[in-house]
Amino acid sequence: MNIQRKKRHYWLRGLGLSLLLIGSLQLWCAWQVYRFSQPKNDLPQADAAVVLGAAAWGNRPSPVFRERINHALTLYQMGYVRKLIFTGGTPKSGYETEAEVARNFALKQGIPEQDILIEMRSKNTYQNLVNTRFLMQKHHLRDIVIISDPLHIARAMAIAEDLDIKANYSPTPTSRYHNASWQTQAAFFIQESYALFIYHLLHFGRSISKIII
């Protein structure tokens, strides 16, 4: 009977510790999302600005995507970066990729074609940055500035760090989420905090499996 009690005691302690660790990680992820979303007083310099993909409406960038592109153009025009990298594939064949839509938008704003790089195969943030790393190596770019919506930055920076990409960040100063209702803002904050939490869990799992194997 004592053995059974001890087993249950250790099991409950293990469960309690696991829940504590999971809760702590969730709180830490929420803090990271909040911290990285805050406006930056200084604009970072780098070899290139990377615009993470977002929805394209036909051959036009969605409002969210357009704000990301415009912020990258501002950094380029002010001399903070010398190259622009646009990322993103397409959900359906026969449509322009997100990267192509962004490139065409930038060309219409007078950006020289030789200063634009694109990758057109990615479907998510992780693939955006994996393919960006390849472009950096191919074109001898040392560092980048990641551009996305404020609440998306924390996850993008975590991925960049895991991929050994030397990166800074610059959240878009304007976004549809800034003018959204508090319910919409809260929902997006929770969504991004959860996405970052899941990413760290999966990354930890992959790291453990490599050690075991």
Language-model-detected regions and their locations in the chain:
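A transmembrane-helix-recognition feature enriched in membrane-embedded lipid enzymes
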Residues: 31, 182-212
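N-terminal membrane-anchoring alpha-helices
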Residues: 1-47, 209, 213
